[in-house]
Amino acid sequence: MSAKDVKFDTAARSRMLRGVNTLADAVKVTLGPKGRNVVIDKSFGAPRITKDGVTVAKEIELEDKFENMGAQMVKEVASRTNDQAGDGTTTSTVLAQAIVNEGMKAVAAGMNPMDLKRGIDLATSKVVEAIKAAARDVKDSDEVAQVGTISANGEAEIGRQIADAMQKVGNDGVITVEENKGLETETEVVEGMQFDRGYLSPYFVTNPDKMTAELEDPFILIHEKKLSSLQPLVPLLESIIQAGKPLLVIAEDVEGEALATLVVNKLRGGLKIAAVKAPGFGDRRKAMLQDIAILTGGQVISEDLGMKLESVTIDMLGTAKKVAITKDETTVVNGAGEKAEIDARVSQIRTQIEETTSDYDREKLQERVAKLAGGVAVIRVGGMTEVEVKERKDRVDDALNATRAAVQEGIVVGGGVALVQGAKALDGLQGANPDQNAGIAIVRRALEAPLRQIAENAGVDGSVVAGKIRESDDATFGFNAQTEEYGDLFSFGVIDPAKVVRTALEDASSVAGLLITTEAMVAVKPAGKGAASPAMPDMGGMM
């Protein structure tokens, strides 16, 4: 086992503090509408340019083990805020730095670290309550666009596109962000349920120009197992021909004789038909087939439920207004399922989302909700160069997360003012002893740090701006760093999601409290440079 280097109290805290400040100083230059870029070297290809706090934080690794521990703890703040709210990572880093620096001074002055932490926790909970109370619901798509614009560093086009996408797919819809090949940033909305399985044979194509199979008002047969023979389906197929409608077959696979029969039938101009594989795998496939059945008002033909293909009747099939199939994906538009059943299915999946601990499962469940309840929108981010596209994609991701957070918990005044106003909730708050009161005072001072940093990044004195806002009785009065004007921030469109502000403060004070109460640090001792390899033992008596 390698030797360890151990540091105690002041020696430990000072080294850790250096690491905290190194990381936070690199991250905080990105804060606000006039925040600067950070250029990150890559081992291959062009360097990455970003204004995303968590991206900068994740790249930082310090040589000194003790300094690196401090940096990694603050990196944890940014990562946690990013996971919970998707934005506000720079704000949480700035808050953590401010609380840690003030807290370390108090510890050096002889105060009890545990009481300081209790005071910090007490103050944080009070300010969080104030932020929740001050939040108001998002009224319209213009406010959604404003939130997106602020988070995308003032790029109104990004805010508008996100607002339009959310309006089209609803608050439950899935919006994904991809890189575009061209210069333009564009939004594509897919209505209805789409899954990534295409037609099993190109002979099913009805539109040769687009190479798509389009079925108008079709019946939909949903089968859990493979179809290798159509013999059991003959009575059903005769009923469908009499009804004069097309048929879509969704099954685990359609193979051999069954597929050949369907293709020959289509080429001879008999039944208009197409077949696709079922989406997903294993248990997820069963769940997705059930989703399709509920959406289209049909039933999953499953042997587990004692159903046989021979006994399937036309009323067990689903229907939809239209089905469009390409070689890669199938889209079911306007399924004929009962709204009450679809709503019940959505709430059932939402319960699973709340209970799951896996990020992957949560993402897949959210996709299923979107396909049932709303739709799917894709924002394709364009730019002149690959570096620019990646930088813009970071900002679009942030803006998208911020708008989702705004819809969930409402909005508060932006520009760091919500935290300064939240500090008023600490007036008259007393801890159990003077050291706890010092912890409360630390939070009060730290709450101004994001506002000051936004002003400093805009080239304005942060102390002057903070002083003016403290003196104002108007809760929405603040400094618009983009235009360098004072006034009502709501009317300027400078707004933040309450969830982002709340999460940033909670995560920052949590990790800062741990850093302040650190008394010893243990790290692996670096191996001495040029250390000689151990000599061979004396083998005695060898020739």
UniProtKB/Swiss-Prot annotation:
EC numbers, comma separated: 5.6.1.7
Location within or outside the cell: Cytoplasm
Matching CDD domains: GroEL (cd03344)
One cellular-component annotation, GO: cytoplasm
Gene3D superfamilies (UniProt xref): GroEL (3.50.7.10), GroEL-like equatorial domain (1.10.560.10), TCP-1-like chaperonin intermediate domain (3.30.260.10)
InterPro entries: Chaperonin_Cpn60_CS, Cpn60/GroEL, Cpn60/GroEL/TCP-1, GroEL-like_apical_dom_sf, GROEL-like_equatorial_sf, TCP-1-like_intermed_sf
GO MF annotations, alphabetized: ATP binding; ATP-dependent protein folding chaperone; isomerase activity; unfolded protein binding
Reactions performed catalytically: ATP + H2O + a folded polypeptide = ADP + phosphate + an unfolded polypeptide
EC category name: isomerase
UniProt entry keywords in alphabetical sequence: ATP-binding, Chaperone, Cytoplasm, Isomerase, Nucleotide-binding
GO biological process: protein refolding
Main location: cytoplasm
Keyword Cytoplasm tagged: yes
Binding-site residues, ATP: 30-33, 51, 87-91, 415, 496
SUBUNIT field: Forms a cylinder of 14 subunits composed of two heptameric rings stacked back-to-back. Interacts with the co-chaperonin GroES.
HAMAP family per UniProt: CH60 (MF_00600)
Family listed: Belongs to the chaperonin (HSP60) family.
Primary role: Together with its co-chaperonin GroES, plays an essential role in assisting protein folding. The GroEL-GroES system forms a nano-cage that allows encapsulation of the non-native substrate proteins and provides a physical environment optimized to promote and accelerate protein folding.
Protein's UniProt name: Chaperonin GroEL 1
Species of provenance: Roseobacter denitrificans (strain ATCC 33942 / OCh 114)
Lineage of the species this protein comes from: Bacteria, Pseudomonadati, Pseudomonadota, Alphaproteobacteria, Rhodobacterales
Record gene name: groEL1
